[in-house]
Regions:
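Eukaryotic N-terminal targeting leaders
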Residues: 1-33, 314
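C-terminal His-loop and adjacent cap/lid subdomain of alpha/beta-hydrolase
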Residues: 10, 17, 135-136, 270, ...
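Short, surface-exposed loop and linker segments with low hydrophobicity and enrichment for Pro/Ser/Thr
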Residues: 16-19, 67-74, 299-302
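Small-residue-rich
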Residues: 18, 31-56
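N-terminal regions that are enriched for targeting/export leaders
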Residues: 54-55, 65, 310
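Catalytic core of Fe(II)/2-oxoglutarate
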Residues: 237-314
Length: 314
C-alpha cells in the first residue's frame, strides 16, 4: 500500500465546512468470494492477510485542528485529550494494564457516557510491529507476545452486535452475557485506541459512519484456533454498485502525528444506534477502520499503540 500528499480541500461535516489536508492512500477492502465459505481459523487472514482482498485508493483527511467536530454518536468515533499515569514500559505487563490502565479507560468512557451503569473489559492488544503491506505473504500470527502484533491493514469493524455478546460470554461466562441481554439496556461496544508515543508511520484511519451503507458490510462468523467463536464485520468498498469505475464513497479520517494524549474511541456496535443489523436499510452507527502506510516513513520508529475493547451498559 502507498499514499501521496495532495492539495488541501474543503470537507463538509454536518453543517460545518473545514479545510483539511488530503492524502491519497490505498486500503485493503473485502472482496467476497464467488463461493461462500464456512468459518474457520483461516478467517483471521481476512483481517491480516491477502485472501479475498480488494485494494482501493481513497482520500484520507487529517482531522488535526478540527478533531472536536467529530462525535461518537454522530460519526462513530471521537478524539479525546487525555493523560495517563502509565509509562510506556508498563504496557509490557498485563497485570499493570488491568490494574492501572483499565480504570483510566473507564474514566474516559464516562466522559462521553456519564450515564454508564456497567463496563465490561473484553481484553487489550499492545501493538509494536511494522504494518504488513506485502499481502502475498502469509498472515502474521495472532498470538504473538506483547508488542509483537502488527497494525491491522484490512478495513473492518471489530464486533457485530451479536459478536459483542459472544465475546462477553467467552470472557465472563454465558450467564453474564444472558443477564446483560435480559436487562434490556442500551449496550455499546468500543475500541479505545491510544498511541504509546507519537505516531510517525502506519497511522490508524477511521470512517465517518454516515458515509457507510449497510450493503458495504459483510458479517463474518469466526472460529478461532482455540475453538472460541465470534462475529465481526469486513467491509466492501462499494456494496451498492460493483463497477470498478465508481470511486469508494467512504469518508476516511486520521490524525497526523497522533500523540499519546490523543485518545481515539471507535464505536463497533450499539443496540440503540447501529440498527442495520436488525432492520434492512437501518443506520450504520459503527466506524470501519484500518491502518495504512505513509511513503517515506519506512525508517521512522515503529508505531506502538494499545487498544482496549469493552462493552458498556447505559
Amino acid at each position: 500500500m502507498s499514499s501521496t500528499q495532495t492539495e488541501t480541500k474543503t470537507q463538509i461535516h454536518g453543517s460545518i465546512a473545514v479545510e483539511a489536508p488530503e492524502l491519497r492512500v490505498k486500503l485493503a477492502y473485502y472482496l467476497p468470494p464467488e463461493v461462500p465459505r464456512a468459518p474457520s481459523i483461516y478467517d483471521l487472514e481476512l483481517i491480516n492477510g491477502s485472501r479475498d482482498q480488494d485494494i482501493v485508493e481513497v482520500a484520507m483527511h487529517d482531522v488535526r485542528g478540527h478533531e472536536s467536530e467529530f462525535k461518537i454518536d454522530t460519526h462513530g468515533f471521537q478524539y479525546l485529550k487525555v493523560n495517563s499515569a502509565m509509562a510506556k514500559e508498563d504496557f509490557d505487563y498485563d497485570e499493570r494494564i488491568e490494574e492501572k490502565y483499565f480504570p483510566e479507560v473507564e474514566e474516559w468512557i464516562r466522559r462521553l457516557y456519564p450515564q454508564t451503569t456497567k463496563i465490561h473489559h473484553l481484553g487489550h492488544i499492545v501493538r509494536g510491529a511494522v504494518l504488513q503491506t506485502d499481502f502475498s505473504k502469509p498472515a502474521p500470527a495472532w498470538n504473538k507476545p506483547n508488542r509483537g502484533i502488527a497494525p491491522a491493514p484490512r478495513v473492518h469493524i471489530d464486533f457485530t452486535r451479536e459478536g459483542g455478546f459472544l465475546v462477553l460470554a467467552q470472557a465472563f461466562g454465558k450467564e453474564l452475557s444472558d443477564e446483560v441481554r435480559a436487562r434490556g439496556r442500551r449496550v455499546l461496544c468500543f475500541s479505545i485506541w491510544r498511541p504509546l508515543s507519537t505516531v510517525r508511520r502506519d497511522p490508524l484511519g477511521v470512517v465517518d459512519c454516515n458515509s457507510v451503507h449497510e450493503a458495504d458490510l459483510f458479517k463474518l462468523a469466526r472460529i478461532f484456533p482455540d475453538g472460541a467463536r465470534g462475529e465481526n464485520v469486513v467491509v466492501k468498498a462499494n456494496g451498492r454498485t460493483l463497477p470498478e469505475s465508481r470511486p469508494c464513497g467512504h469518508k476516511w479520517h486520521y490524525m497526523n502525528e497522533q500523540t499519546s494524549q490523543d485518545l481515539l474511541i471507535i464505536k463497533t456496535s450499539d443496540t440503540g444506534d447501529c440498527d442495520w443489523e436488525m432492520t434492512p436499510g437501518g443506520r450504520v452507527g459503527s466506524s470501519p477502520h484500518a491502518s495504512f502506510a505513509l511513503p517515506g516513513t519506512e525508517n521512522e520508529p515503529i508505531r506502538e499503540s494499545v487498544e482496549v475493547r469493552c462493552i458498556i451498559e447505559l
